[in-house]
Amino acid sequence: MQHHACSPPRLILASSSRYRRELLERLRVPFDVVAPEIDETPLPDETPCATALRLAAAKARAAAERARAPHGALVIGSDQVATFDGLQIGKPGTHARALAQLQAMRGRDVEFHSALCLYDSRSGATQSEDIVTRVRFRTLTDVELDAYLRAETPYDVAGSAKSEGLGIALLDAIDSDDPTALVGLPLIALTRMLRAAGYPLFGAPAPAADGVNGR
Protein backbone atom coordinates (compact mmCIF):
# COMPACT_ATOMS: atom_id res chain seq x y z
CA MET A 1 0.00 0.00 0.00
CA GLN A 2 1.47 3.37 -1.05
CA HIS A 3 1.20 6.38 1.25
CA HIS A 4 1.93 9.90 0.09
CA ALA A 5 2.77 12.79 2.37
CA CYS A 6 -0.76 14.19 2.15
CA SER A 7 -2.47 10.81 2.67
CA PRO A 8 -3.94 9.88 6.05
CA PRO A 9 -2.02 7.21 7.94
CA ARG A 10 -2.94 3.58 7.57
CA LEU A 11 -5.60 2.54 10.08
CA ILE A 12 -5.37 -0.89 11.68
CA LEU A 13 -7.89 -2.64 13.91
CA ALA A 14 -6.08 -4.94 16.33
CA SER A 15 -8.88 -7.45 16.71
CA SER A 16 -10.30 -10.58 15.14
CA SER A 17 -13.81 -9.76 16.42
CA ARG A 18 -16.45 -9.53 13.73
CA TYR A 19 -18.49 -7.19 15.94
CA ARG A 20 -15.64 -4.72 16.43
CA ARG A 21 -15.01 -4.77 12.69
CA GLU A 22 -18.67 -4.03 11.98
CA LEU A 23 -18.61 -1.13 14.45
CA LEU A 24 -15.52 0.40 12.85
CA GLU A 25 -17.13 0.09 9.43
CA ARG A 26 -19.75 2.60 10.61
CA LEU A 27 -17.11 5.33 10.39
CA ARG A 28 -16.68 4.73 6.64
CA VAL A 29 -12.90 4.83 6.84
CA PRO A 30 -10.52 2.35 5.18
CA PHE A 31 -8.80 0.02 7.62
CA ASP A 32 -6.99 -3.29 7.84
CA VAL A 33 -7.52 -6.01 10.42
CA VAL A 34 -4.54 -7.56 12.17
CA ALA A 35 -5.23 -10.11 14.90
CA PRO A 36 -2.90 -9.59 17.87
CA GLU A 37 -1.42 -12.54 19.73
CA ILE A 38 -0.95 -11.73 23.42
CA ASP A 39 -1.37 -13.35 26.82
CA GLU A 40 -4.64 -11.99 28.23
CA THR A 41 -4.18 -13.36 31.75
CA PRO A 42 -4.89 -10.69 34.42
CA LEU A 43 -1.98 -9.84 36.70
CA PRO A 44 -2.22 -10.53 40.44
CA ASP A 45 -4.16 -7.81 42.30
CA GLU A 46 -4.76 -5.93 39.03
CA THR A 47 -7.94 -3.85 38.94
CA PRO A 48 -10.45 -4.47 36.12
CA CYS A 49 -9.72 -1.02 34.69
CA ALA A 50 -5.96 -1.63 34.76
CA THR A 51 -6.35 -5.04 33.12
CA ALA A 52 -8.50 -3.70 30.31
CA LEU A 53 -6.21 -0.72 29.63
CA ARG A 54 -3.06 -2.85 29.71
CA LEU A 55 -4.46 -5.45 27.32
CA ALA A 56 -5.85 -2.84 24.91
CA ALA A 57 -2.40 -1.24 24.67
CA ALA A 58 -0.68 -4.62 24.34
CA LYS A 59 -3.00 -5.61 21.50
CA ALA A 60 -2.34 -2.35 19.65
CA ARG A 61 1.43 -2.70 19.93
CA ALA A 62 1.38 -6.40 19.01
CA ALA A 63 -0.70 -5.69 15.91
CA ALA A 64 1.60 -2.82 14.93
CA GLU A 65 4.57 -5.19 15.03
CA ARG A 66 2.77 -7.85 13.01
CA ALA A 67 1.52 -5.35 10.41
CA ARG A 68 5.03 -4.20 9.47
CA ALA A 69 3.76 -0.87 8.16
CA PRO A 70 6.88 0.92 6.83
CA HIS A 71 5.13 4.30 6.76
CA GLY A 72 3.59 3.87 10.19
CA ALA A 73 -0.03 3.42 11.20
CA LEU A 74 -2.68 4.32 13.72
CA VAL A 75 -3.50 1.08 15.50
CA ILE A 76 -6.73 0.56 17.44
CA GLY A 77 -6.55 -1.82 20.38
CA SER A 78 -9.47 -2.66 22.63
CA ASP A 79 -10.28 -5.00 25.48
CA GLN A 80 -13.25 -5.60 27.72
CA VAL A 81 -13.37 -6.82 31.30
CA ALA A 82 -16.59 -7.55 33.18
CA THR A 83 -16.92 -7.37 36.96
CA PHE A 84 -19.58 -8.76 39.27
CA ASP A 85 -19.57 -8.60 43.07
CA GLY A 86 -16.10 -7.04 42.88
CA LEU A 87 -14.58 -9.92 40.91
CA GLN A 88 -13.53 -10.11 37.27
CA ILE A 89 -15.74 -12.31 35.12
CA GLY A 90 -13.85 -14.31 32.57
CA LYS A 91 -14.99 -15.85 29.31
CA PRO A 92 -16.97 -18.94 30.34
CA GLY A 93 -15.62 -21.30 27.69
CA THR A 94 -18.30 -23.92 28.32
CA HIS A 95 -22.09 -24.10 28.43
CA ALA A 96 -22.11 -25.08 32.10
CA ARG A 97 -19.93 -22.14 33.19
CA ALA A 98 -21.92 -19.71 31.05
CA LEU A 99 -25.17 -20.89 32.61
CA ALA A 100 -23.68 -20.50 36.09
CA GLN A 101 -22.60 -16.93 35.24
CA LEU A 102 -26.05 -15.95 34.00
CA GLN A 103 -27.78 -17.59 36.96
CA ALA A 104 -25.59 -15.63 39.38
CA MET A 105 -26.14 -12.33 37.55
CA ARG A 106 -29.90 -12.38 37.02
CA GLY A 107 -31.56 -9.39 38.60
CA ARG A 108 -28.13 -7.96 39.43
CA ASP A 109 -25.85 -5.20 38.16
CA VAL A 110 -22.67 -5.98 36.23
CA GLU A 111 -19.94 -3.49 35.28
CA PHE A 112 -18.14 -3.70 31.95
CA HIS A 113 -14.81 -1.92 31.42
CA SER A 114 -14.30 -1.28 27.69
CA ALA A 115 -10.74 -0.02 27.25
CA LEU A 116 -9.50 1.62 24.08
CA CYS A 117 -5.97 2.43 22.96
CA LEU A 118 -4.96 4.34 19.83
CA TYR A 119 -1.27 3.75 19.16
CA ASP A 120 0.59 5.85 16.59
CA SER A 121 3.48 3.68 15.42
CA ARG A 122 5.08 6.69 13.70
CA SER A 123 5.73 8.56 16.94
CA GLY A 124 5.03 5.99 19.64
CA ALA A 125 2.29 8.22 21.07
CA THR A 126 -0.72 6.55 22.67
CA GLN A 127 -4.16 7.66 23.72
CA SER A 128 -6.01 5.46 26.20
CA GLU A 129 -9.43 5.52 27.81
CA ASP A 130 -11.64 3.19 29.85
CA ILE A 131 -15.38 3.50 29.29
CA VAL A 132 -17.52 1.96 32.03
CA THR A 133 -20.95 0.51 31.24
CA ARG A 134 -23.32 -0.63 33.99
CA VAL A 135 -25.77 -3.32 32.98
CA ARG A 136 -28.72 -4.75 34.91
CA PHE A 137 -29.66 -8.29 33.99
CA ARG A 138 -33.28 -9.42 33.88
CA THR A 139 -34.53 -12.14 36.19
CA LEU A 140 -35.07 -15.00 33.77
CA THR A 141 -35.75 -18.69 34.37
CA ASP A 142 -33.13 -21.40 34.02
CA VAL A 143 -35.02 -22.69 30.98
CA GLU A 144 -34.82 -19.25 29.30
CA LEU A 145 -31.14 -18.85 30.11
CA ASP A 146 -30.33 -22.33 28.81
CA ALA A 147 -32.29 -21.68 25.60
CA TYR A 148 -30.44 -18.40 25.05
CA LEU A 149 -27.05 -20.04 25.46
CA ARG A 150 -27.92 -22.80 23.01
CA ALA A 151 -29.16 -20.23 20.49
CA GLU A 152 -26.16 -17.86 20.60
CA THR A 153 -23.33 -19.88 22.24
CA PRO A 154 -21.62 -16.81 23.77
CA TYR A 155 -18.89 -18.88 25.41
CA ASP A 156 -16.09 -16.58 24.25
CA VAL A 157 -17.67 -13.46 25.76
CA ALA A 158 -17.10 -12.14 29.28
CA GLY A 159 -20.50 -12.08 30.96
CA SER A 160 -21.96 -14.76 28.66
CA ALA A 161 -24.23 -12.34 26.81
CA LYS A 162 -23.84 -10.75 23.38
CA SER A 163 -25.70 -7.44 23.62
CA GLU A 164 -25.27 -6.92 19.88
CA GLY A 165 -27.41 -10.02 19.29
CA LEU A 166 -30.10 -11.97 21.12
CA GLY A 167 -28.27 -11.27 24.37
CA ILE A 168 -29.97 -7.86 24.51
CA ALA A 169 -33.07 -9.76 25.69
CA LEU A 170 -31.21 -10.72 28.87
CA LEU A 171 -30.74 -7.09 29.86
CA ASP A 172 -33.09 -4.82 31.76
CA ALA A 173 -31.09 -1.57 31.57
CA ILE A 174 -27.81 -0.18 30.24
CA ASP A 175 -26.08 2.90 31.64
CA SER A 176 -23.14 4.24 29.61
CA ASP A 177 -21.73 7.41 28.07
CA ASP A 178 -21.07 5.48 24.86
CA PRO A 179 -23.74 3.11 23.46
CA THR A 180 -21.14 1.21 21.41
CA ALA A 181 -18.85 0.50 24.36
CA LEU A 182 -20.73 -2.60 25.50
CA VAL A 183 -20.19 -4.27 22.12
CA GLY A 184 -16.45 -3.76 22.59
CA LEU A 185 -15.36 -0.76 20.52
CA PRO A 186 -16.37 2.65 21.99
CA LEU A 187 -16.83 4.77 18.87
CA ILE A 188 -17.38 8.08 20.65
CA ALA A 189 -14.01 7.76 22.38
CA LEU A 190 -12.38 6.41 19.23
CA THR A 191 -13.50 9.29 17.02
CA ARG A 192 -12.27 11.73 19.66
CA MET A 193 -8.87 10.03 19.63
CA LEU A 194 -8.66 9.88 15.84
CA ARG A 195 -9.47 13.56 15.58
CA ALA A 196 -6.82 14.38 18.21
CA ALA A 197 -4.33 12.39 16.13
CA GLY A 198 -5.17 14.47 13.07
CA TYR A 199 -7.04 11.74 11.21
CA PRO A 200 -9.52 13.21 8.65
CA LEU A 201 -12.73 11.47 9.71
CA PHE A 202 -14.95 13.46 7.38
CA GLY A 203 -12.51 13.61 4.50
CA ALA A 204 -11.53 17.11 5.63
CA PRO A 205 -8.28 17.82 7.52
CA ALA A 206 -8.57 17.51 11.27
CA PRO A 207 -6.92 20.12 13.52
CA ALA A 208 -3.19 19.66 14.05
CA ALA A 209 -2.57 16.82 16.45
CA ASP A 210 -2.08 18.07 19.96
CA GLY A 211 -2.83 17.01 23.48
CA VAL A 212 -2.04 13.39 22.67
CA ASN A 213 -1.18 11.77 25.95
CA GLY A 214 1.49 9.24 26.62
CA ARG A 215 -0.51 6.93 28.82
Curated annotation (Swiss-Prot):
The active site is at 79 (proton acceptor). It catalyses: N(7)-methyl-GTP + H2O = N(7)-methyl-GMP + diphosphate + H(+). Its EC number is 3.6.1.-. One of its GO terms (molecular function) is nucleoside triphosphate diphosphatase activity. Keywords: Cytoplasm, Hydrolase, Nucleotide metabolism. The keyword S-adenosyl-L-methionine does not apply. InterPro entries: ITPase-like_fam, Maf-like. Its cofactor is a divalent metal cation. One of its GO terms (biological process) is nucleotide metabolic process. The keyword Hydrolase applies. Its main location: cytoplasm. The record marks 19, 80, 164 as: Important for substrate specificity. It is an enzyme of class 3 (hydrolase). It holds the Pfam family Maf. One of its GO terms (cellular component) is cytoplasm. Transmembrane segments: none annotated. It is found in: Cytoplasm. Nucleoside triphosphate pyrophosphatase that hydrolyzes 7-methyl-GTP (m(7)GTP). May have a dual role in cell division arrest and in preventing the incorporation of modified nucleotides into cellular nucleic acids. Belongs to the Maf family. YceF subfamily. This is 7-methyl-GTP pyrophosphatase.
